[in-house]
Curated annotation (Swiss-Prot):
Superkingdom, taxonomy of origin: Bacteria
Pfam families according to UniProt: DsbD_N (PF11412), DsbD_TM (PF02683), Thioredoxin_7 (PF13899)
HAMAP family assigned: DbsD
Name of this chain's protein: Thiol:disulfide interchange protein DsbD
Ranges of the Periplasmic topological domain: 22-195, 260-273, 336-356, 413-414, 460-600
GO biological process, one term: cytochrome complex assembly
Cytoplasmic side: 217-238, 295-314, 378-391, 436-438
Chain spans, region Disordered: 164-183
Catalytic activity: [protein]-dithiol + NAD(+) = [protein]-disulfide + NADH + H(+); [protein]-dithiol + NADP(+) = [protein]-disulfide + NADPH + H(+)
Length: 600
């Protein structure tokens, strides 16, 4: 397969372009009055943006959200748990793909959502706790919202309420809605339609793994074992090889399901910075094994036992061949251990059972395609072994190195994320240019590889050159406006009193890690030199409400803050400036114009 390296080099050219992320969120209450800054809000309260309803029918609780036009809910921020109550399995309709510069790719809901929740075992005081978050498309995010629903006793077998009683929850009304839950087959179709690229990518990776030096030379031997050493018709050979591959695919699919299921239980932990750093180190270790620094494989004793178990099966028979394939899926060669581990880490991160099963099944099918071809058409279809197989293995190492950058760019500044992508691109395309003369083809194909490598080097070097050629701008971006953090209402009152004594105006910025537009303010507005000069005479305060703790909620209510970003202003006399509040992102010039209009 002489065009394989061509395909992978073009694929890598796409992979090494910086990937920017999404994810935002969330909801707060609007029950307080603006004791500090009675300002008109541009955005509606959370209960108007995402009207929430729930009603219980026997042993099923139906949870419904309406979504106002111009707003959306985040799928991965919807959490449902029980208190004194066992909840059965449930699923959310697959959300729409959405991309954001700062938080990556997530799924969102822009239309009504209904979740039928099966209730299994009731205890006195049973409650269902629902958490969710959402944003406005205009760049305004709500803090996390929590709803508590009291559950009446029920009979799970008869599906009828035994002792109806009035719902005492003060947080949630329970009117019935007309939203019908999405059927299982529709949900499955939506998942497959929205993640169509995942199986194709894993299929391509499987084919690529087949051409590594630990795998390709084994295909003729493996084919002989599968066919039982007999001369068979092409139809029989095709059937046996397909059955073998299906056995291997079954093992991979089960691995995908198990790992995705485990990942689903720890999705919050998998987003923690320390966990992301740990996973990044693991991916780097896997990549280094592909570069030949060391070998990763099962312990020799385990491999010997699995091989003997596989050899005990009867080649040429359908059950025996299927069993051989299933067992072979557990025997990872040094060339496949790292990529397979990386694939399993990917599906663990996704926490999606369907994605895990389909991705690993496609990977196994990709690895099995050459085996099927050899079984049916003979060894003449296989390319000659050579150093080019080591090149394929090394290429997988660079692909694995892209994974930790995807993970780390969620927690490192954009500048360092750009540096990491540039470094990876320079290393990969530099290696590709270095080895182009040793590839198993010449002529225009070799020239094309050289052109791709040079273009990749130039593209990878561009971000670094931009920083080096504009040192003033880079230094300006690294240096951020220094805010004084306040944690509660008392600290705000003290800071306002101190600023009044100094005769200085005050700007209070509400910030949260989940707020997309807050990061836009940091990157584009607060880094601007003119904005820095304008705010040099202000007392700059910042409240980090990421955790949405009681003191954060108290502060938000006191200032009638519905969501983020929100920026408040007080003049030098310590009085709130009418109509000065900023909700939603403002670029440099509109921000400066706004301050001027408000006399600040």
């Amino acid at each position: 397969m002489r065009t394989l390296i061509l395909c992978f080099s073009l694929l890598f050219a796409l992979l090494t372009q910086p990937a920017w992320a999404i994810f935002g969120n969330n909801a707060g209450n609007n029950t307080g009055t603006a004791s500090f800054a009675p300002t008109q809000n541009r955005f509606v309260p959370v209960d108007e943006a995402f009207p929430f309803n729930a009603f219980q029918q026997g042993s099923t609780l139906f949870i419904d959200w309406q979504v106002k036009e111009g707003y959306y809910l985040y799928q991965d921020r919807i959490s449902i748990s029980g208190e004194n109550l066992e909840i059965g399995e449930y699923s959310l309709t697959e959300g729409e793909p959405y991309h954001d510069e700062f938080f990556g790719d997530v799924k969102i809901y822009t239309t009504p959502l209904s979740v039928p929740l099966p209730l299994v075992a009731y205890q006195s005081g049973a409650k269902v706790i629902v958490q969710y978050q959402g944003c406005a498309k205009a760049g305004f995010c709500y803090p996390p919202e929590t709803r508590v629903i009291d559950i009446t006793p029920f009979n799970a077998e008869s599906n009828r309420v035994i002792e109806p009683k009035t719902n005492t929850s003060t947080q949630t009304t329970l009117p019935q809605t007309d939203n019908a839950p999405t059927s299982a087959q529709d949900s499955l179709a939506n998942k497959l339609a929205q993640n169509w690229w995942t199986p194709l990518l894993f299929l391509a990776l499987g084919v690529g793994l087949a051409f590594t030096p630990c795998v390709l030379p084994m295909y003729p031997i493996l084919t002989s074992i599968v066919l039982g050493g007999a001369q068979l018709t092409q139809r029989r050979a095709l059937l046996l090889s397909v059955i073998y591959v299906q056995g291997m695919a079954l093992t991979y699919t089960l691995l995908g399901l198990v790992v995705a299921s485990a990942g689903l239980q720890f999705q919050a932990a998998l987003q923690h910075p320390y966990v992301l750093m740990g996973l990044s180190v693991l991916f780097v270790a896997l990549a280094l094994s592909m570069f030949g620094l060391y070998s990763l494989q099962l312990p020799s004793g385990v491999q010997t036992w699995l091989n003997s178990l596989s050899n005990a099966q009867q080649g040429g028979s359908l059950p025996g061949v299927f069993a051989m394939g299933a067992i072979s899926g557990l025997v990872c060669s040094p060339c496949t251990t790292a990529p397979l581990s990386g694939a399993l880490l990917y599906v663990a991160q996704s926490g999606d059972l369907l994605t895990g099963a389909v991705a690993l099944y496609a990977l196994a099918i990709g690895m099995g395609i050459p085996l099927i071809l050899v079984a049916v058409f003979g060894n003449k279809l296989l390319p000659k072994a050579g150093n080019w197989m080591e090149r394929v293995k090394t290429l997988f190492g660079f692909v694995l190195l892209a994974a930790p950058i995807f993970l780390l760019e969620r927690i490192v500044p954009e500048f360092w994320s750009s540096v990491l992508w540039s470094a990876l691109g320079l290393a990969a395309f530099g290696w590709l240019y270095h080895v182009k003369n040793s590839l198993p083809f010449g002529g225009w194909k070799q020239s094309l590889i050289g052109i791709v490598a040079i273009l990749g080097l130039l593209a990878s070097a561009q971000p670094l050159l931009n920083h080096w050629l504009a040192p003033t701008q880079t230094a300006q971006q690294v240096k951020q406006i220094q805010f004084t953090r306040i944690a509660n209402l008392s600290e705000l009152q003290s800071a306002l009193a101190e600023a009044k004594a100094q005769g200085k105006s005050v700007m209070l910025d509400f910030y949260a890690d989940w707020c997309v537009a807050c990061k836009e303010f940091e990157k584009y507005t607060f880094h601007a030199k003119q904005v820095e000069n304008k705010l040099s005479g202000f007392v700059l305060l910042q409240a980090d409400v990421t955790k949405n703790q009681p003191q954060d909620i108290e502060l938000l209510k006191a200032l009638n803050v519905l969501g983020l970003p929100t920026i408040e202003f007080w003049n030098a006399q310590g009085e709130p400036v009418p109509n000065a509040r900023i909700t939603g992102f403002m670029a440099e010039q509109p921000f400066l114009d706004h301050l001027t209009q408000q006399g600040l």
